[in-house]
């Protein structure tokens, strides 16, 4: 007998006892059953849930501390094992960031005055790459190597775009920067189709109309392919719907595709990703590791 059957039998037994004591008629018994069922299946679980939540909130500090203590010890062991490599990585990130800062300070006035789209795009990519590399460092030091690889994918994507812009110059860089309008409009349209199910407020029709108008003007200027993903590179690639793999080839970085694919296993919900475990044990890890 399962829990529901046991609960139903207990309710019926109690209803029969109360009905006999109070000499209830058929209508009274029905009302009593309704009250008992509501109390058991609606009020009861709510009271239990409220109590469980209250106890859980009281236990959170202790629970988190129990998790934090071994994690801190683990990170210290990981640092001791991989300190040389981690220090080299961090020093590379620091030097790269400092070089970017010097370049930005030297050319800032030139960028603002001449509205040089190429320099602006490359500087923005450099900033994003420094932030991403810093995230890789944090993940490595915490033992999340697969997640660090996932962020390395972003570094590869940034490198591909940077190489492509450098090769083709300011006209392509301008298209790249203006493509933010296309992505904003696409996001707004997706929100418009989903806000009700999300339980959010509807978008402002005026804002959406404004975004679409900006998109349409850019498509008139650069062609209808501009509205597609990577549409800013459509003319350079020679395809209406270029893919990132097309961009890799055009940037002469497609030889790194195997690394990019391997890093993707930690990102996407594929079968391969479920089996690729960066560890020396066959145990399925739900915690960080030193490899």
What kind of feature is each model-predicted range?
Residues 1-110, 180-291:
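Secondary-shell segments that build the walls of catalytic and ion/ligand-binding clefts
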Residues 148-149, 166-177:
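Short, glycine/acidic-rich hinge or "gate" loops at secondary-structure transitions
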Residues 95-164:
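Long, hydrophobic/aromatic-enriched structural stretches that serve as scaffold segments
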